[in-house]
Amino acid sequence: MEPLGRPQEGAIARTELALLAVGALVLSLVASWPLILHLGDSLPDLGFGDPYLFSWQMAWDAHALVTAPLEILDTNTFWPLSGDLVFQDAFHGFSPLALIGEGTAAAVIRYNFVYLFAGTLAFIGAYLLAREIGLGPIGAVAAGIAFAYAPWRIDQHTHIHVISSGGVPLTLFLLLRGYRARRAGLVLAGWVVATWQMSLGFTLGIQFAYLLFAIGIVCIVWWLKAGRPQVAAPLIRATAVGIVLFAGWTIWQALPYLQLQDRLPEARRTTEELGFYSPGLGGFGAASENNLLWGEVTEPVREKLRWPTEQTLFPGVATIVLVALGARFAGLPKRLRSLLVGSLLVTGFLALGFGTSASTAVYEVLYEIAPGWDAIRTPGRLMTLATVASSLLAGAGLQRLWDARGGHSGRSRPLATGALIALTAVLWFEGLGTTPLSTPPPVPEAQQLARPPILHLPTNGIHDRVYTFWSTEGFPEIVNGVGVLDLRHTRELRASVRGFPDGSSVAMLRKLGARTVIVHLDRLEDPDAWLQAATERARDLGLDERIVGRSIVYELDDN
């Protein structure tokens, strides 16, 4: 038996591929319901506003590629800072889509398309990988569901760069298939997909790179033990080109972030920050509050977590049962099953981060010496790699039960078949959750009339996400900005404009070079009281004040 499972004989039939694509899309549409009814007017958001930020980021990348590709890092936000795109997670892979359409309306539709595509590709990638290691269609379906709809992913639905993980299993499928079939084109395609996955950010990219490195080491050891068998020249060339492409893109993408750490010391993740986000063992027993089946049941465990959004790692009961069965499935080689179980345990352990004393001892070493490891802000997202292993084992578990139907006869066989289909449905239902839809507020007329650079008030992390999203309309320079870093510049700016319009804040903004301040009354706690006091102070300072809709526009200069 092959050490990595019986290879799929020949190409997968076109009918199966067509059914796979349609089925994966249908599952994604149903799981995200009713998003399909609101593609142009709502965003899936858990309340933190991250989709607003990613919508803008995709649009900015495309805008910069067309207008000033060499200045892509200098966005229209965080004015007057430069190189500020690295304050965000890298997310370039979907940017070409933003070449179609412009403005906030197109940004919403584009984001929702990517959101639906993420779930679709995750299922397809895991399905194909499961088929390649020797599972039948039913086992591959279970693997696809267990990966794309793992319960822990529900709280990550607002993080498009986390749920866009389908490139991981798809890469493994293409590489495994390519090397087995000695098809250089598939091998190169695997490395291209790996590079694309890296382009979606280091959140998954770093752990994925280490996975590929570990697999490479295992392959080299196997090759040496096998007596150094001859490798076809086309495979060597495809591998070399692929590695250069993957490494080259990774280095190019990483350089601005490495330079940022030299420029801003606060850009490096601290162990205190990692400790805050690290889950304890209780994270494995806590499902998202939005989980339809397990949210309420696991609430007592979830309430003990510091930051549940990043610490709910519940794998699902059906997954646990199927993984246990799959670990002893004779249809897969023992070596492969051992590798999958070992990978699951190791990556699951690392996902605890600084959450336990044992995991801290290991994670701290990686944090200090492993290149790039200190950039991982939330260790729980390492569950992506754990889920690759658990999904394949879960698929093997269902395949084992499916194959055992041969021992049934008469009426019991259809009953057994129905029971396994029901189990597959339960596996999927365990990973379903409610993701609230957020309707983006329309771009205020005041922004269209204001002269940039603009400061929007009030300002905080939530408000600034909306202002950044609004700036997709024309990309005016704005002083506001929000990213994944807790920048001292941003803290000081927000503190200094808290009393606007007063002498100190106006003087600071004029020195900064801001030309317009827009105060959005609907975002103030007591707009009437604020407006009355602000009007008097603005008059004393000689500021030009205009009411435009539900916004107040202040001109800071006379030019």
Where do the PLM segments sit?
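Membrane-embedded helix bundles of polyisoprenyl
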Residues: 24-28, 115-133, 137-223, 239-252, ...
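Signature aromatic-anchored transmembrane alpha helix within multi-pass, membrane-resident enzymes
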Residues: 239-247, 392, 397-430
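Membrane-interface helix-loop-helix junctions at transmembrane boundaries of multi-pass membrane enzymes
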Residues: 12, 224-239, 323-362, 405-413
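Membrane-helix boundary/interfacial segments in multi-pass membrane proteins
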Residues: 44-47, 155-162, 300-311, 346-389, ...
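Hydrophobic alpha-helical membrane-interfacial segments at the cytosolic entry of transmembrane helices
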Residues: 16-25, 193, 216, 229-255, ...
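Start-transfer (signal-anchor) and selected internal transmembrane alpha helices
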Residues: 1-35, 236-244, 328, 332-343, ...
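Extracytoplasmic
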Residues: 262, 266-275, 402, 422-559
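Membrane-interface coil-to-helix junctions
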Residues: 27-122, 146, 150-165, 275-303, ...
